[in-house]
Design a protein with these regions (language model features):
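Hydrophobic/aromatic anchor residues within beta-strands of the central parallel beta-sheet
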Residues: 53, 114-116
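Short, well-ordered alpha-helices that flank and scaffold nucleotide-derived cofactor binding pockets
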Residues: 15, 19, 42, 105-108
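A short helix-coil junction within the Rossmann-fold of NAD(P)-dependent oxidoreductases
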Residues: 84-85, 106-113
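SDR active-site strand-loop-helix element
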Residues: 3, 27, 74-78, 116-120
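NAD(P)H-binding glycine-rich loop region in Rossmannoid oxidoreductase-like domains
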Residues: 31-35, 41-98
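N-terminal Rossmann NAD(P)H-binding glycine-rich loop of SDR-like oxidoreductase domains
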Residues: 1-27
């Protein structure tokens, strides 16, 4: 699974994994938003590979648990993106910490995840 798959880093990771014929669960904030999914759906998939786009809210622990369920590896690139804020702690730092904690808690609650890669 790649969190933040619609972002710059996440989408490049997804493209690389698909080019190697891997199955990828790609999480996005809004699966109905063409800006978030069209570029992912247009990626080349090598033989044996598969792309599954899943909507996930980092701040909703149940959403994160559903997305992690059944995955062997998690590459966590998702983050709350706010370009400018006078309340950076509240709008950027706290949500990023909670989101990462939700990912880690979801991984801890399952026996299937064997590998975690976290970017920051």
């Amino acid at each position: 699974m790649v969190t933040g798959a619609s972002g710059y880093i996440g989408s490049h990771i997804v493209a690389n994994l698909l080019s190697k014929g891997m199955s990828v669960r790609a999480t996005v904030r809004d699966s109905s938003d063409p800006e978030r999914v069209d570029h992912l759906e247009s990626l080349s998939v090598s033989d044996g590979g598969h792309l599954e786009i899943v909507e996930m809210d980092l701040l909703d622990s149940e959403s994160v648990h559903r997305a992690v369920s059944g995955c062997e590896s998690v590459i966590h690139t998702a983050a709350v993106v706010v370009l400018k804020s006078k309340r950076a702690q509240e709008k950027i730092v706290d949500p990023s910490v909670v989101g990462t904690r939700n990912v880690l808690d979801a991984i801890d609650s399952t026996d299937c995840v064997k590998c975690l890669v976290h970017t920051s």
